[in-house]
């Protein structure tokens, strides 16, 4: 059997594959990791069963339940997922169908999402990556006045629904963005509250403000959903439904992948193999960076999303046993083939202090023009991916390739 075949994880029914042949996990390495593998499988089962995962805050971590509420450990938690989900879908449908309208316009045409970190990165990624026919999406994700006014001045204010997202309701950047937006609406003669939606914890500062000021809608964010993993919660689903995304399909895709990555078989579990590859590449301490190279314009924000998800999750001074480890994985990236004209030169010839994650999207929806005999732009894109991966491999640089059918 070829090295490629040995190191391939493929889910044909999902159209997804992961190629570890440029960062191979041999039997000797897997054997040396068996104790950690067994613990990870056991800890994952405990986590999804409701074990306390955050010892500092004494709370569960339940973002996995969002994709399949049947996994929630209590009926109350299941209801806390199903109820808001139904409410989100109904709200989005009513906005897009024109049943919920702004006071001074026939229908909403735009949505302004105000948030930061996980409250913005996930929704921004979905808005940028998934084509849909709903509202035009805009974001305030910083406290830079110039950036905020640039966005605000481009909005059709009377047709804009504002979604303010903050778990605690007291995040300074989000609060600042909300106050600036409120002031901008007022100065332009448009009422803010009737066009405003809050996504926040029950009883938070934002929740109380929205209630007192008579905002259009409030959606509850649970304390067992962390910001960086909240894209499948109301945090991500409210903007997604307004954008016109079929959130049932979004959740179903995540659920199907969850099922594939709960198998105790290491060689057929993509999540476990990714974790092992990261461990091997970084010597278990984050000694190398991860460079994310999606060869698709629609995924240009994916590296930013992964940057928070991975670095905030793994960047720790102490491990769960209380040992000082000061470890993590630094993540950066942009998109291919743009990166080939930016920093791939250093990746190939400079310090070998990274491993790469290539993301291949096999199909293009608009690719009919031949730019050379028998070759389209999409063919060139695929060729650049394969050529860059091979050039890095020839220079002793490790990589993983994730292949998906489309976005």
Predicted regions and their residues:
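Extended, charge-enriched "interface" segments that sit outside catalytic cores
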Residues: 1-104
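Structural alpha-beta junctions
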Residues: 32-47, 134, 192, 215, ...
């Amino acid at each position: 059997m070829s090295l490629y075949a040995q190191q391939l994880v493929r889910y044909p029914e999902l159209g997804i594959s992961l190629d570890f042949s440029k960062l191979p996990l041999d039997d000797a390495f897997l054997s040396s990791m068996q104790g950690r593998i067994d613990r990870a499988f056991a800890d994952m089962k405990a986590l999804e069963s409701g074990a306390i995962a955050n010892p500092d805050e004494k709370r569960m971590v339940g973002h996995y339940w969002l994709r399949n509420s049947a996994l929630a450990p209590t009926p109350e938690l299941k209801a806390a997922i199903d109820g808001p989900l139904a409410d989100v879908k109904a709200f989005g449908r009513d906005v897009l169908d024109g049943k919920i309208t702004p006071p001074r316009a026939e229908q909403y045409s735009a949505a302004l999402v105000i948030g930061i970190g996980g409250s913005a990165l996930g929704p921004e990624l979905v808005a940028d990556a998934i084509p849909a026919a709903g509202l035009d999406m805009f974001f305030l994700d910083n406290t830079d006045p110039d950036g905020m006014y640039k966005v605000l001045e481009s909005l059709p204010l009377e047709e804009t629904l504002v979604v303010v997202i903050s778990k605690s309701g007291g995040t300074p950047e989000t609060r600042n963005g909300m106050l600036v937006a409120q002031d901008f609406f007022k100065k332009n003669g448009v009422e803010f509250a009737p066009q405003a939606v809050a996504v926040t914890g029950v009883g938070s500062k934002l929740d109380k403000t929205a209630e007192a000021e008579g905002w259009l809608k409030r959606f509850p964010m649970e304390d067992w959903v962390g910001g960086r993993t909240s894209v499948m919660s109301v945090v991500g689903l409210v903007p997604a439904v307004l954008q016109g995304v079929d959130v049932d399909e979004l959740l179903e895709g995540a659920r199907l992948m969850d099922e594939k990555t709960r198998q105790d078989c290491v060689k057929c579990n993509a999540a476990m193999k990714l974790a092992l590859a990261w461990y091997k590449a970084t010597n278990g301490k984050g000694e190398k960076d991860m460079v994310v190279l999606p060869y698709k314009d629609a995924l240009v924000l994916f590296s930013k999303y992964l940057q928070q998800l991975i670095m905030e999750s793994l960047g720790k001074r102490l491990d769960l046993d209380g040992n000082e480890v000061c470890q993590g994985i630094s993540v950066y990236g942009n998109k291919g083939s743009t990166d080939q004209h930016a920093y791939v030169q250093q990746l190939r010839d400079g310090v070998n202090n990274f491993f790469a994650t290539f993301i291949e999207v096999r199909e293009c929806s608009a690719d009919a023009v031949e730019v050379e005999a028998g070759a389209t732009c999409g063919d060139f894109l695929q060729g650049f991916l394969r050529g860059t991966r091979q050039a890095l491999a020839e220079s002793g640089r490790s990589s993983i390739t994730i292949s998906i059918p489309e976005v």
